[in-house]
């Protein structure tokens, strides 16, 4: 249920191109810097920083002499066989709350737990599976206990529509990448004129 990636300059996906997925993702920066874009907002993540990417968020990362790691996971995993925590997890899955997307070493509680989580998946000592699951619950517990989230997030209809259109274009490119693509085709995939699409 957990996909782990260690990414250095020789990795085929060193530059994290703009993409999205239904799974959640946690990124930690080990060295250098990573210019992270979430939807249409960018910031620079430095060594020791932790980035939390919600389900469905368009995101990319431009590395600068960077070594970073990612864990991609299905949030529904945490609903199984654990009714005591289900109410909290559902708030995350239903986007009633949005966990802060950027934690720095100024949040040592979060950094310690997330670093332990990454180290367990990276080094895989005996029993690491229990450490991983336990540290995920520990992370969520800290998020709720310290209010490291935004409540009842409302996206403006205009912003929501733009993000939806960006996702449609990315899907179109992904499904037709083997063929030459024209501006006309890209703009038509989101029902726009080529002129307006270029300003989009």
What are these regions (language model features)?
Residues 121-138, 160:
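All-alpha amphipathic helical-bundle segments outside canonical DNA-binding/catalytic cores
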Residues 145-148, 168, 172-200:
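Basic/polar phosphate-binding segments, predominantly the helix-turn-helix DNA-binding elements
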Residues 10, 150-157:
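Short, Lys/Arg-enriched N-terminal segment that forms or immediately precedes the first helix
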Residues 109, 158-169:
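N-terminal positioning helix adjacent to the helix-turn-helix/winged-helix DNA-binding module
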Residues 54-56:
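Residue-level recognition of conserved beta-strand edge/terminus positions
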Residues 30, 111-125, 170, 174-177:
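Regular secondary-structure segments
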Residues 1-7, 58-122, 141-150:
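A hydrophobic/aromatic-rich effector-binding and dimerization subdomain
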Residues 1-46, 50, 63-65, 85-88, ...:
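Generic protein-terminus/edge-of-domain signal
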